């Protein structure tokens, strides 16, 4: 069951944490898949298609799960997705009552199904057939055998597969969990993917950190909320659904306090809290990936399970192609359109009233104009009190915000409070005073300066300005002239009308275009042929993979370091906010708590976004464009040089931007 109605509630109350994604966009990722829900999906899909019968072999054993699992595994491998299947083991004691209830419900469904068959009631048959499906231990074992023959890792959980999947996600073995049970979120998996193994439904991505931020709940409160919604490890309160559960948690903070106020009892909730907090999992140090056993797979499918040879040959051909080709990181998945908001059908029909979940606080630095100049959008909309967490609720930073280059440090936007002030405010006119959110560097603790002060940033990656809107014509001319002068390349008159073949993230590219323009008259047919046949020659997929991995590692280490110091940053933000409010109220000694929370959250959010904005998806494209441009230039320079002369690197240095050291511009290298 998972958590009853959770996904439907999140789609209404925190839609920003849910999106629809394509399988193609997951290329290059490793995903832990809850095997039990996947096998159930495969079996029920086939049984629903035929109303009653499953696929079976000559011994009468079901093979529906084998057919579905094999096809889906091959599809995932073809897309460059690395699945890890996790199987349930002995269920925890806290789940015994739930399992007993499920057994009774299944027996009732079997009786109802028999009656529906006798009456030839197709709608009733369709309704009850899914409720009678059960994955046996023998089917589990055959699924494990199949996966090992295919070469897909199999992990047997200590108890619950969802908990083991979440453990793998926390330890960095996988990037997401594929399951239909939402309790993987309660077990602290960062990203949940629903419908991953369904063939006719879009994949739904749920971000835990964003959900907690939008709901304004700590993870402990989120756990209590999910227990009240209904979970597998204890009962729930009568008449309490997701809407009521959320309002109760927001009002009282915990189940124990709710029970105290309502004078009710909830048997087993403490055991459920403990199990969600510290589930029994198998300690994993490595995940071994092996080659597919083609001969063994053929024997298993044809001899043991009576698959047709023709069908098996086609499946094995697809598998070998998927396993033999190198997993390439899809540029489309890097720089494609953002995920669509998910259209989730709620599991309950009562509309949610009185729930005002917070919206995402807009970034102070979220875009650049078309001409490449930094824009500072107006920020006169301060989030409402419901949108601001208290100081002790530190927002998690598991998802890097997608924002553009920060504006100059001396051009930080100001904020105007437009909400109704507290009654203790002495003069209503003071609401209109604008106070800058920037803080003097000298007031920032030394250990926090590298997070808050732009000039103290320690870049792990730098982005070279390469776009047409980022470079002036004089700068481009100077760079190309310097390159040609260093290597003695006879440059001709630039042809501004030269048509350069190119597409993708590398273009438009004024540096490459200018270099090709001045070398177009050289008697070098090979160079001209390169221009015609390739827009990004000189860089292999291996090199591109390394660049991407370098960017990801830099992002992950930056996020990890921010999270480590987040409590101290919040404390400092609170101190700065208090000082700003005092200034705003002309020295008043009172500090309205609502404004303190609002300003603390605002400062923290802006500092975080400015520190991490360099790792957004659009920044990745700019990073790759700069690095690939250098490699392509080196290749083309070498084509212009005589035998025995080689260019290994460009005769250029970089200088950091005066506004942000993460961004650099190329300059001629002195002495070259």
UniProtKB/Swiss-Prot annotation:
Enzyme Commission number: 3.1.-.-
Cofactor(s) annotated in UniProt: Mg(2+)
Modifications after synthesis and translation: Phosphorylated. Phosphorylation upon DNA damage induces relocalization to the nuclear plasma.
GO CC list: mitochondrion; nucleolus; nucleoplasm
Binding site for Mg(2+) 1: 34, 88, 160, 162
Basic and acidic residues composition bias: residue spans: 370-382
GO BP annotations, alphabetical order: base-excision repair; DNA replication, removal of RNA primer
Main location per the UniProt record: nucleus
Positions of the UniProt region annotated as Disordered: 361-436
Subcellular location: Nucleus, Nucleolus; Nucleus, Nucleoplasm; Mitochondrion
Gene3D superfamilies given in the database record: 5' to 3' exonuclease, C-terminal subdomain, 5'-nuclease
Domain of life: Eukaryota
Matches recorded under InterPro entries: 5-3_exonuclease, 5-3_exonuclease_C_sf, Flap_endonuc, HhH2, PIN-like_dom_sf, XPG-I_dom, XPG/Rad2, XPG_DNA_repair_N
Keyword field contains Nucleus: yes
Pfam families: XPG_I (PF00867), XPG_N (PF00752)
Record keywords: DNA damage, DNA repair, DNA replication, Endonuclease, Exonuclease, Hydrolase, Magnesium, Metal-binding, Mitochondrion, Nuclease, Nucleus, Phosphoprotein
Subunit structure comment from the entry: Interacts with PCNA. Three molecules of FEN1 bind to one PCNA trimer with each molecule binding to one PCNA monomer. PCNA stimulates the nuclease activity without altering cleavage specificity.
PANTHER family linked: FLAP ENDONUCLEASE 1 (PTHR11081:SF9), FLAP ENDONUCLEASE FAMILY MEMBER (PTHR11081)
Family: Belongs to the XPG/RAD2 endonuclease family. FEN1 subfamily.
UniProt cross-references to HAMAP family, sorted A to Z: Fen
Name of this chain's protein: Flap endonuclease 1
